[in-house]
UniProtKB/Swiss-Prot annotation:
Keyword Disulfide bond: no
Any Pfam family matching the protein: FAD_binding_4
Protein name stated in the entry: UDP-N-acetylenolpyruvoylglucosamine reductase
Originating gene: murB
Sample GO molecular function, one term: UDP-N-acetylmuramate dehydrogenase activity
Species name: Nitrosomonas eutropha (strain DSM 101675 / C91 / Nm57)
Recorded metabolic or biological pathway in which this protein acts: Cell wall biogenesis; peptidoglycan biosynthesis
Any GO BP: peptidoglycan biosynthetic process
Active site feature: 194, 250 (proton donor), 320
Required co-factors: FAD
Broad enzyme group: oxidoreductase
Keyword Heme appears in the UniProt entry: no
Length: 332
């Protein structure tokens, strides 16, 4: 199922185009900036600049932006930036930030057998968990342990403490490179551990697509018990994760039948450091920024850990975080 976003402009009308972009910025209601430091937008607090950075006013404005943005210019989207490492050489094209505006959070229906919540891509996962608890719905408590937004959780099937995002999804809303909105169901996707891909049999979006919201089906619960479960999860995070330092959460996926943190610790790598990028002594699957780490230092730690763990265990750790952008000069 798909619907077309209503564009509040005449797409055939003459426009005063920006020479640099080929886009009429008068058509936009959001904020477009150039040479934006991405370290301000990612949880590692490191990395280069984005050539362009756009904060849409709302979903309709995002559709307009994508429709007019030059098709040969790269597009990426970000929530709280908790799963990205932007290389020091920066990003071409545009990075679109969703967390400030695509934050609708609605109780769509509530019956004796449960309820349905719609959450926009920019809603923090912990906020969705608390919202569900407030409305006596259970099953979303684990989301309190995910340090990102709904959009990112949908894109990677984020999970923790034995639960995963797509176990609760009834359907999702996506937007493609042309600004067209689509509604899809879990059956349209191949869903696995930290992986979500469209089936080949599903007509593809124009060239790529992004999650802009999702409907979550939850079972009936009790507000107090859910609140206590969320509180317990947050307490566990505080005790076991280095929340006092910039990081991106878990860096590596757990290999089948094992844990990345256990393998890293087994190899004696807790506290391993390059510059200001260090493997946490509290949780071995976290790389923290101890001060002024560069993206290159963080990526070098990642590569070194992968090499050492493989050499000692013959297990190649796969990154859970996304490493994007260009290297600076001759680095790496």
């Amino acid at each position: 199922m798909q619907t077309k976003a209503r564009l509040p402009v005449d797409i055939n009308a003459p426009s005063l185009q920006s020479p640099a972009l080929g886009i009429d910025t008068h058509l936009l209601r959001g904020e477009l900036r150039q040479h934006e430091p991405m370290k301000q937008h990612v949880s590692w607090r490191a990395g280069g600049h984005a050539a362009y950075f756009y904060q849409p006013a709302d979903l309709e404005d995002l559709a307009v932006f994508l429709h007019f943005w030059p098709k040969d210019e790269p597009v990426m989207m970000i929530g709280l930036g908790s799963n990205f490492l932007v290389r020091d050489g920066g990003l071409p094209g545009v990075m679109i930030a969703l967390h400030a505006k695509l934050n609708d959070l609605l109780l769509v229906e509530q019956e004796e057998d449960g309820g349905l919540i719609y959450a926009g891509a920019g809603v923090p996962c912990a906020k969705l968990a608390r919202f569900a608890s407030l409305h006596n719905l259970a099953g979303a408590e684990f989301l309190a342990g995910i340090p990102g937004t709904v959009g990112g959780a949908l894109a990677m099937n984020a999970g923790c403490y034995g639960s995963e995002t797509w176990e609760r999804v009834e359907r999702v809303k996506t937007i493609d490179r042309d600004g067209t909105l689509h509604e899809r169901t879990p059956e349209d996707y191949r869903i696995g551990y930290r992986q979500v891909e469209l089936h080949e049999v599903v007509p593809p979006d124009t060239s790529c697509s992004w999650f802009v919201g999702g409907w979550f089906r939850l079972r009936p619960g009790q507000q107090e018990s859910s609140r206590q479960a969320v509180k317990a999860l947050l307490g566990t995070r505080i005790k076991t994760q280095p929340l006092g330092f910039p990081s991106a959460g878990s860096v590596f996926r757990n290999p089948p039948g094992d844990y990345a943190a256990r393998l890293v610790e087994q190899c004696g790598l807790k506290g391993f450091r390059i510059g200001d990028a260090m493997i946490s002594t509290l949780h071995a699957n976290f790389i923290i920024n101890c001060g002024h780490a560069t993206a290159t230092e963080i990526e070098t730690v990642i590569n070194t850990v992968q090499d050492i763990v493989y050499k000692k265990t013959e297990i190649r750790l796969v990154t859970e975080v996304r490493i994007i952008g260009q290297h600076k000069g001759n680095e790496l």
